[in-house]
A protein has these predicted regions:
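Extended, small-residue-rich solenoid/repeat segments and analogous flexible loops
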Residues: 1-36, 154-161
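Glycine-rich hexapeptide-repeat left-handed beta-helix
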Residues: 1-6, 40-48, 54-56, 61-68, ...
Length: 161
């Protein structure tokens, strides 16, 4: 695959982050230290205001792109593989979300959770465990947005130097 990387002017990509393949990074999004985004066979779209934190791994499979919605926080060491993440989602430290999984808007995926292939997480879910399970529902959009806004400010500050 020919590399087709698109980074919005207002986005921040740390110099140690690795982007390869067909990747788009939207306005106000950020990709932090040592994150790896590989898309040899399908597109990776990182939405407006989303943050991909340190050491995150994002990868695709044939026919399984990755979409990260607007104002999401994908936290340290998380892995996204061929999945769809709705808007205003927080994915906890070291969580893994696998091929064909769909995480509904406003959800929180707890640290170390393993969301298996093709699992569908309803909007506003709180999810923990390996294998992952929904333990309750709550509207987390505002809290998740506040976290994302923090990273928007950080990204802008890093861009300014």
């Amino acid at each position: 695959m020919t590399s087709r990387i698109t980074i919005a002017d207002s986005a921040f990509v740390h110099p140690s982050a690795q982007l390869y393949g067909h990747v788009s990074v939207a306005d106000d999004a950020s990709v932090w230290c040592n994150a790896v985004v590989r898309s040899e066979v399908a597109h990776v779209a990182i939405g407006r205001g989303a943050n991909i934190q340190d050491f995150v791994m994002i990868h695709t499979d044939p026919g399984k792109p990755v979409t990260v919605g607007a104002y999401c926080s994908i936290t340290h060491h998380a892995t996204l593989h061929g999945c769809t993440i709705g808007d205003h989602v927080l994915v906890g430290v070291n969580a893994t979300i696998f091929n064909g999984a769909v995480v509904g808007a406003g959800s929180i995926i707890g640290q170390h959770a393993y969301v298996r292939d093709f699992m569908e997480i309803p909007p506003n879910s709180i999810v923990v465990g390996s294998p992952a399970k929904v333990i309750r529902t709550a509207d987390n959009r505002l809290a998740n947005r506040v976290n994302a806004e923090f990273y928007i400010r950080n990204g802008a500050a890093y861009k300014r130097g």
